[in-house]
Amino acid sequence: MVFVDRLLATLVHLRHGVTHDVLACWFGVDRSTVTRAIGEVRPLLAERGCTISPDVRLRTLAEVVDHLGATGKLGIIDGTEIRVRRPAAGRKDRDKFISGKNKQNAVKAMVFTDGDGRLLFCSPTRPGTCADITHARELGLVKLLADGPPVEILADAGYQGLGAQTGGRVVTPPHRKFKKNAPDWYEEMHERQRKAHSSRRIRVEHGIAHLKNWRALTRHLGRREHMDDTVQAIAGLLSQQQTADLILARQT
């Protein structure tokens, strides 16, 4: 297969979840040829990073924090789960992929968008048992925010505690001080603050929804070892589409 055909096969596989067998029939080649082609192109797409302008791409979390600090934009983070096949029977780590949230075999990725919902970064995946806040710490987000430029990052209650570790740069929903028998004035204030935070943070949910429109992330039926490249390749392609749409909108 020439490079254009290999690229096209990879894009169709990622966008529509078409199996290697079907792609082999379409291109008139052996299934192993398609598998090898996708295995070669997918890492190349993943290495491109997320496009924020025609000449600027963000490839690491440090670059994202620097970009937000330089532009003064708001950042939003959230974790998302992607269903995967259950590990084979007898494996000692078989249960670590079971999500405590959905009770399904899954891996987690941390998604980073700006205040407008534009995709800036999608992290490598972790097993479904890994908590969102643990994943953020493992990625070095706490140190990057504590030592980096002053930025504001919105997050949900799963990241409660990062605010104190980053000097207040991670903003989570207001903590409820009354467990029960709260005064009416407090209930109204807490609900108002919670809704205000949620209405700002919803943009990252939209970004995740756009990611999940790619069938390869609806449920991953391939090898889990390829998940990191798959997630980051799709994030890069989606961010490039968002940037192109934004440029076109400005020209019209």
Short names for language-model regions:
Residues V22-A46, P54-T252:
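Short, well-ordered secondary-structure "scaffold" segments embedded in the functional core
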